[in-house]
From Swiss-Prot:
One of its GO terms (molecular function) is toxin activity. It comes from the Eukaryota. Residues 1-20 are annotated as: Disordered. This is Conotoxin Cl14b. Expressed by the venom duct. Coiled coil: none annotated. Contains 2 disulfide bonds. Residues 1 form a propeptide. Keywords: Cleavage on pair of basic residues, Disulfide bond, Neurotoxin, Secreted, Toxin. One of its GO terms (cellular component) is extracellular region. It comes from Californiconus californicus. It is found in: Secreted.
Length: 20
């Protein structure tokens, strides 16, 4: 997933870093 495409279960640093 990319920064603009964050799933509901992803949030915080992982979403910002794009490591979802």
């Amino acid at each position: 997933y990319r920064r603009r495409q964050c799933p509901p279960w992803c949030s915080g640093e992982p979403c910002r870093k794009g490591t979802c």
